[in-house]
């Protein structure tokens, strides 16, 4: 591999903005903010959504029940199914 063309792969702190949870992982992301954890300074990246706050992972997911096009068609067809237009 060529020297100097690859981004720096380092430990970075990702913080969930909604819950405030922080976790350290490795990444090549660039950020200006830093945070100190256990006496060591890490770059800080703030995330809007992580597995700590996303409804799919927390179990707080609510399903939106919305009538689709097929159901709307069937409802409309059911109302008019009994009435047949007579040919004059």
UniProtKB/Swiss-Prot annotation:
Coiled coil: none annotated. PROSITE patterns: RIBOSOMAL_L31. GO terms for cellular component: ribonucleoprotein complex; ribosome. GO terms for biological process: translation. GO terms for molecular function: structural constituent of ribosome. Keywords: Ribonucleoprotein, Ribosomal protein. The keyword Glycoprotein does not apply. SUPFAM superfamilies: L28p-like. Belongs to the bacterial ribosomal protein bL31 family. Type B subfamily. Part of the 50S ribosomal subunit. This is Large ribosomal subunit protein bL31B. It comes from Bordetella pertussis (strain Tohama I / ATCC BAA-589 / NCTC 13251). The gene is rpmE2.
């Amino acid at each position: 591999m060529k020297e100097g063309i690859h981004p720096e792969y380092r430990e970075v702190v990702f913080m969930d903005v909604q819950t405030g949870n922080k976790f350290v992982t490795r990444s090549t992301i660039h950020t200006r903010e830093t945070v100190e954890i256990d006496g060591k300074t890490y770059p800080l990246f703030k995330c809007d959504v992580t597995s700590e706050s996303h409804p799919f992972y927390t179990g707080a997911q609510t399903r939106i029940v919305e009538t689709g096009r097929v159901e709307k068609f069937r409802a409309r067809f059911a109302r008019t199914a009994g009435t047949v237009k007579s040919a004059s």
